[in-house]
């Protein structure tokens, strides 16, 4: 009988990769907002709202990627930071 919680490794890697790619789009939005604000420092409230929104979603996607990597034992949330470089490195380790 097939285990109902069996994880398809390739599908999981694809999902993690998608989560990391999406997180980077939010990081690019943050970087763009910073550059725009430095050039036009007149709308501080819009700047902070945009940063807050994008940062929250950035963290959501990074946390989901971390949770998936934790499922296969490739990430230790207690001792590692769920940031892009760490998660990307773990994904590369799993892919090889």
Regions found by a protein language model. Give the residues of each.
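Non-transmembrane amphipathic alpha-helical segments
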Residues: 19-33, 68
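Intrinsic disorder/low-complexity segments in short proteins, especially the signal peptide
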Residues: 17-18, 25, 74, 92, ...
């Amino acid at each position: 009988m097939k285990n109902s919680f069996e994880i398809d490794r390739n599908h999981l890697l694809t999902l993690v990769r998608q989560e990391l790619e999406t997180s980077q789009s939010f990081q690019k939005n943050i970087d763009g907002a910073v550059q725009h604000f430095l050039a036009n420092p007149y709308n501080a409230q819009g700047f902070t709202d945009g940063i807050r929104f994008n940062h929250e979603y950035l963290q959501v996607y990074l946390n989901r990627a971390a949770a998936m990597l934790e499922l296969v034992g490739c990430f230790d949330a207690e001792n590692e930071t769920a940031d892009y470089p760490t998660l990307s490195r773990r994904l590369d380790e799993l892919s090889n």
